[in-house]
Amino acid sequence: MTGTLVLVRHGQSDWNLKNLFTGWRDPDLTDLGVQEANAGGKALKDYGIQFDIAFTSDLSRAQKTCGIILDNLGQSGLETIRDQALNERDYGDLSGLNKDDARAKWGEEQVHIWRRSYDIPPPGGESLRDTGARVWPYYLTEILPRVLRGEKVLVAAHGNSLRSLVMVLDKLTKEQILSVNLATGVPMVYKLNADSTVASKDVLGDMSGAH
């Protein structure tokens, strides 16, 4: 067994609360989102982990979640790499729209297909497959080598960018990943083997409220 990879979806954002498609837009965390990030940090502290490096996206809601977690671990000065490769899925023309308004405009079935299909993107946006096509190469070149060297690595990112990693790590099919939702602020702790496969996975919190 080699290193440890911890994946955390950012805490609730203003636009999560308002039921808006967010994508690459950059709303702040809500008060609840801050609480969720703190809860994730406390869970990791209780777990007894100290990180060697952190990765996060180009968006402030993930960066703030990352910072809050590290504060809870007494690691506020830890090297943190920010890269848009870890950004949320780009929702294109849906970005900034209320999900109910989008259903009224395009129809419930079409919006459901855009949200939950693996490879059909919304107009001007990305599918989950498209998101994985930028996230996975970044993971392979920048993140995985550190884990295989025995480092403990934190990745604070977004629902869909993390789902694209979970799909491969958990060996899920493109049909299975469609029913997987990640709760905000709940750490997933992966210990990897030397061949980069998963040796164990611990979820430090409740995923039942995921959306």
Curated annotation (Swiss-Prot):
Keywords: Gluconeogenesis, Glycolysis, Isomerase. Homodimer. This is 2,3-bisphosphoglycerate-dependent phosphoglycerate mutase. It is an enzyme of class 5 (isomerase). It catalyses: (2R)-2-phosphoglycerate = (2R)-3-phosphoglycerate. Its EC number is 5.4.2.11. Substrate binds at residues 9-16, 22-23, 61, 88-91, 99, 115-116, 159-160. Pathway: Carbohydrate degradation; glycolysis; pyruvate from D-glyceraldehyde 3-phosphate: step 3/5. The active site is at H10 (tele-phosphohistidine intermediate), E88 (proton donor/acceptor). GO terms for biological process: gluconeogenesis; glycolytic process. SMART domains: PGAM. Belongs to the phosphoglycerate mutase family. BPG-dependent PGAM subfamily. It comes from the Bacteria. It holds the Pfam family His_Phos_1. Gene3D superfamilies: Phosphoglycerate mutase-like. The record marks H158 as: Transition state stabilizer. InterPro entries: His_Pase_superF_clade-1 (IPR013078), His_PPase_superfam (IPR029033), PG/BPGM_mutase_AS (IPR001345), Phosphogly_mut1 (IPR005952). One of its GO terms (molecular function) is phosphoglycerate mutase activity.
